[in-house]
Amino acid sequence: MHPALGIRSFENCYDAAARTMGLDPAEKKPIEFDITDTRFINTYFDTAHHPYEEEGVDFWWIDWQQGKKSKLPGLDPLWALNHYHYLDRQRSGKRPLILSRYAGIGSHRYPLGFSGDTFMSWRVLKFQPYFTSTASNCGYTWWSHDIGGHCFGRHDDEMYVRWVQLGVFSPIMRLHSSNDPLSGKEPWNYGWEAEMTAERYLRLRHELIPYLYSMNYRTHKFGRALCEPLYYDNPECEGAYKCRNGYMFGSELLVCPVTSKINKKTRRAETRVWLPKGRWTDVFTGKIYRGSKTVRIHSELNTMPVFAREGAIIPLSLDEGNSCKNPTVLKFKVYRGNGSFSLYEDDGETNGFKDGDFSITELSVSETENGIKLTLCGGKEKDYLPLKRQYVFEFSDIVSAESVRVMSGGEKLDCSVTDAGGRVTVSLPPMEISAPIEAELYGVTVLKNKPKREAVREAMTKFNGINNLKKRRYLILEKAKDDAALLSDVRILVNSALRSELLGGGGDLDYTL
């Protein structure tokens, strides 16, 4: 909505608003906006907003664009609007939620923010990851963008997909555009590959709700933003500052969105990512990287650089549909190492959480002598939680296990175990929310990177180019007697674009541990 326009005669609420303001509705005189007038403020909410809220409107988008001046010197109308909307929304006992423009330092205390009417361009896309994470420096932790760009620019399938990928790993995911019949941001307005890829990522966003909600509580409780620059936890590392578009996405993931075009020869886009100390696993490709350095990631259109730290535990909802209720089927992606995670849940609407009305499920993972152990301490049973919940534990970097044992309250549980797709998945029957669970995998085979030769072959197979030339180069590389010789031959035989791909991402000659 655009409050600066006041209330006009064509609006449904005009007659009631005019009478309340002491005006004759028949004159159709505009009711001018005045945030300093108590009478207008009450009329504004009582006649223009409350009736729609009674019909089901959950929150308002305040699109104020008319500057900082009001009849009261020093009072910014947008600040006042955010303040009054925030207070008014609490009258029903629900949590106040508004979406609004940036009103200066400190204005994060009320709304979810949005970055205005951005152009549809690669340049704008490239700036937004940096903008989002560094906004945390002034406390603005929940920010949103018009995913896909708002106006002008150009229609570009590849750019759209990369923007959607950024949106999925942003605080707020919101497709939006100007009122243009040819600029809709729905996936079906793009080519088949872009549509399918965008759909996949949008579904992933819905699966991530348990993780996002837990991180929201983390922000509330501890002041840690969902998107934080890499230098927050690595202040002495120069690489953390140079990786402008890299950021931690909650406690478990590191993200660096793709913001450059795909190379036509390699069919991938290059992104340079600085990884902190430790082992990092690409959640889309399964490739493992050593930290404390910058790596070059080459992403096809359907992938992007997202890394799980060692010991990461990531909750995902497997419930189908568009519901935001606490899930009945919950999957945890688990990465080997030592780590913990607190899954936070509440009713999602009221302020009962302030009085302790919430449930926290604690999980921890640890590496044992010849396996891995996952422990789950069930949360409180609440009316807003399912009576029983089915858990699925996906050990994402465990290829196989000789045996799996799952216990609850001293009793062994029947479970389904599969090792398809290079990961071990343990599915449990529906259980009470409060039930403790202990899962142990013995004799495990851990995920490893492919041999360098195989990685090079796979990368070169997808390269665009003349087949005979590709084959001649590959046959020379195939004859290399060891990895050092292979590395040397790659540097000599291929051009800069292909060399970067083979050395930094496609063949991943620098990524093995």
Go through each PLM region and give its residues.
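Catalytic-domain carbohydrate-binding cleft regions of carbohydrate-active enzymes
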Residues: 1-302, 502, 507-513
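Structural motif
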Residues: 276, 300, 309, 368-370, ...
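Ordered hydrophobic segments in well-structured contexts
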Residues: 112-113, 248, 254-256, 272, ...
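Residue-level detector of beta-strand structural context in well-folded domains
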Residues: 244-245, 271, 361-363, 415
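Hydrophobic residues embedded in beta-strands of well-ordered beta-sheets
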Residues: 253-254, 370-374, 422-424
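Accessory, solvent-exposed terminal regions and/or long lumenal/extracellular loops of proteins
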Residues: 308-411, 428-513
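Proteolytic-maturation and junctional protease-sensitive modules
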Residues: 273-288, 395-419
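Extracellular adhesion/glycan-binding regions together with long Ser/Thr-
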Residues: 419-431
